[in-house]
């Protein structure tokens, strides 16, 4: 599952005869990306809520599309643009990476800012040269008062390829995912802690209730499996009976849909940047994706709509309680204390402080007492000493830019768990096997870009000549579906 050096993405048939009047790509340019018409309007709509958040980003370009990678408040943000979203997308050669910022003022992505060019008509990216010393030239056209297309030569930007780069692309299938509408996600964000001293608990109880709470605030929803008929949903019936003064619309507002909602868990998130990141990105509705059985557990929030931006928040393994592992699917042996303390009936969207206390102290999820009460505490091993590296660039001898390490996983905060040493996580595909039940299941293999593991590391090191498969090989299918950035 590697990129084909000579692979060419099929061009979209939306080109028209006006291309000739708008200029041709540079002679011998092996790669060309064109935006105009409906495709240009779609990209402008996708960037509209992002404002200036992604102006200083890393652009990873390959035969599958463009991946925009950035860091906001220390958290990883990804925005994929598939080749079908462009009017023309032609690519030959290995994957390339470019820093979007040109001169500390202008960016390759500035053209997509709202009202930057009111009469914008066409955007073209042409990449010439030989890897890893290729050059990207961005040209734009606007429409004059006479309806003619004119190129703005003064706005032409040029950028050299990064001779070396590293980017971590999450991948894999989430253990549990829940889809929230814009009002529902807003309530969840309002319930999250604003500082590290106020941890937030995400909990999916055995009674089918999804709760997000702190010591002072709580919001709850009925979690329903995607595609289940409303006539067979007990939780919907409970909600309909409880809301005597409301109609079906009110019941739907308190119901979230997702996949694997039978997998009960409790997760304590002490990262205070979640609310700030999602508000900066202006995420409306979104999907919460919980990756809890991997060596590096995380929570991913993917926005719905045209932009499909994803933010990844890393979790502490010792603050994760998985109740469904070790039991048959859909029949966890014990629910969490928060679900049992609050009863089986979902509460209203915003509860009082006293009701939130009845859910239990989130810190209780971290101790041995909680492990004994829940029946099983399955925590993933702590990641090895990994640190977040700030992207740095320097000029190479050949004139190309060099970014040694663009990003890496952040190191968890200090602190020792009070629970017993965690056991090896049980893979989902072997959770009912006899070997897994006996605790002899093998540890998952180390992350590999081609094995469908949690993280794939893509790189090119110019001095050594080492290189990984293209950065989009993770989205080509294989044993696991993509991480959820919008690619099929």
Swiss-Prot record:
<dbReference type="GO" id="GO:0042575">
    <property type="term" value="C:DNA polymerase complex"/>
</dbReference>
<keyword id="KW-1048">Host nucleus</keyword>
<feature type="compositionally biased region" description="Polar residues">
    <location>
        <begin position="345"/>
        <end position="355"/>
    </location>
</feature>
<feature type="compositionally biased region" description="Polar residues">
    <location>
        <begin position="383"/>
        <end position="393"/>
    </location>
</feature>
<feature type="compositionally biased region" description="Low complexity">
    <location>
        <begin position="368"/>
        <end position="379"/>
    </location>
</feature>
<comment type="subunit">
    <text>Interacts with the DNA polymerase catalytic subunit UL30. Interacts with the origin-binding protein.</text>
</comment>
<feature type="compositionally biased region" description="Low complexity">
    <location>
        <begin position="331"/>
        <end position="344"/>
    </location>
</feature>
<dbReference type="GO" id="GO:0042025">
    <property type="term" value="C:host cell nucleus"/>
</dbReference>
<keyword id="KW-0238">DNA-binding</keyword>
<dbReference type="GO" id="GO:0039686">
    <property type="term" value="P:bidirectional double-stranded viral DNA replication"/>
</dbReference>
<dbReference type="GO" id="GO:0006260">
    <property type="term" value="P:DNA replication"/>
</dbReference>
<comment type="similarity">
    <text>Belongs to the herpesviridae DNA polymerase processivity factor family.</text>
</comment>
<dbReference type="GO" id="GO:0030337">
    <property type="term" value="F:DNA polymerase processivity factor activity"/>
</dbReference>
<protein>
    <recommendedName>
        <fullName>DNA polymerase processivity factor</fullName>
    </recommendedName>
</protein>
<feature type="region of interest" description="Disordered">
    <location>
        <begin position="1"/>
        <end position="26"/>
    </location>
</feature>
<dbReference type="InterPro" id="IPR003202">
    <property type="entry name" value="Herpes_UL42"/>
</dbReference>
<comment type="function">
    <text>Plays an essential role in viral DNA replication by acting as the polymerase accessory subunit. Associates with the viral polymerase to increase its processivity and forms high-affinity direct interactions with DNA. Facilitates the origin-binding protein UL9 loading onto DNA thus increasing its ability to assemble into a functional complex capable of unwinding duplex DNA.</text>
</comment>
<feature type="compositionally biased region" description="Basic and acidic residues">
    <location>
        <begin position="398"/>
        <end position="409"/>
    </location>
</feature>
<feature type="compositionally biased region" description="Low complexity">
    <location>
        <begin position="437"/>
        <end position="453"/>
    </location>
</feature>
<feature type="region of interest" description="Disordered">
    <location>
        <begin position="469"/>
        <end position="488"/>
    </location>
</feature>
<feature type="short sequence motif" description="Bipartite nuclear localization signal">
    <location>
        <begin position="394"/>
        <end position="413"/>
    </location>
</feature>
<dbReference type="Pfam" id="PF02282">
    <property type="entry name" value="Herpes_UL42"/>
</dbReference>
<keyword id="KW-0235">DNA replication</keyword>
<dbReference type="InterPro" id="IPR046938">
    <property type="entry name" value="DNA_clamp_sf"/>
</dbReference>
<feature type="region of interest" description="Disordered">
    <location>
        <begin position="331"/>
        <end position="453"/>
    </location>
</feature>
<dbReference type="GO" id="GO:0003677">
    <property type="term" value="F:DNA binding"/>
</dbReference>
């Amino acid at each position: 599952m590697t990129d084909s050096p000579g692979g060419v993405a099929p061009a979209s048939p939306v080109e028209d005869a006006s291309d000739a009047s708008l200029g041709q790509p540079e002679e011998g340019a092996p790669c060309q990306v064109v935006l105009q018409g409906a495709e240009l309007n779609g990209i402008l709509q996708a960037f509209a809520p992002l404002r200036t958040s992604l102006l200083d980003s890393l652009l990873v370009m390959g035969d599958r599309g463009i991946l925009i990678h950035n860091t906001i408040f220390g958290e990883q943000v990804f925005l994929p643009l598939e080749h079908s979203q462009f009017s023309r997308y032609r690519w030959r050669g290995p994957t390339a990476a470019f820093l979007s910022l040109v001169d500390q003022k202008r960016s390759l992505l500035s053209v997509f800012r709202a009202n930057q060019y009111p009469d914008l008509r066409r955007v073209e990216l042409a990449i010439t040269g030989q890897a890893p010393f290729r050059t990207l030239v961005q040209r734009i056209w606007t429409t004059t008062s006479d309806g003619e297309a004119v190129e703005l030569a003064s706005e032409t930007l040029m950028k050299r390829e990064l001779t070396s780069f590293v980017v971590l692309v999450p991948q894999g299938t989430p253990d549990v995912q829940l889809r929230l509408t814009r009002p529902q996600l807003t309530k969840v964000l309002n319930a999250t802690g604003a500082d590290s001293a106020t941890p937030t608990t995400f909990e999916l109880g055995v009674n089918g209730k999804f709760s997000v709470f702190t010591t002072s605030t709580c919001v709850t929803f009925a979690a329903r499996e995607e595609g289940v008929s409303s006539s067979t949903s007990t939780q919907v019936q409970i909600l309909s009976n409880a809301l005597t003064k409301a109609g079906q619309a009110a019941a739907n507002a308190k119901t979230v849909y997702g996949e694997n909602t039978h997998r009960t868990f409790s997760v304590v998130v002490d990262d205070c940047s979640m609310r700030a990141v999602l508000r900066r990105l202006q995420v409306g509705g979104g999907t919460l994706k919980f990756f809890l059985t991997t060596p590096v557990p995380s929570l991913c929030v993917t926005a719905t709509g045209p932009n499909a931006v994803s933010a990844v928040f890393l979790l502490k393994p010792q603050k994760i309680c998985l109740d469904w592992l070790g039991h048959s699917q859909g029949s966890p042996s014990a629910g969490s204390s928060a679900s049992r303390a609050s009863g089986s009936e979902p509460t209203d969207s915003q509860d009082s402080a006293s009701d939130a206390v009845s859910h239990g102290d989130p810190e209780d999820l971290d101790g041995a007492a909680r492990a004994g009460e829940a029946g099983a505490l399955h925590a993933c091993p702590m990641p090895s000493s990994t640190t977040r590296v700030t992207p740095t660039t320097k000029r190479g001898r050949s004139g190309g830019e060099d970014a040694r390490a663009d990003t890496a996983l952040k190191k968890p905060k200090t602190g020792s768990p009070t629970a017993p040493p965690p056991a090896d996580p049980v893979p989902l595909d072997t959770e009912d096997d006899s070997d897994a039940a006996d605790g002899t299941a093998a540890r998952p293999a180390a992350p590999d870009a081609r094995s469908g593991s949690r993280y794939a590391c893509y790189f090119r090191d110019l001095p050594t000549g080492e290189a990984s498969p293209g950065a989009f090989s993770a989205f080509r299918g294989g044993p696991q579906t993509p991480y959820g950035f919008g690619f099929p």
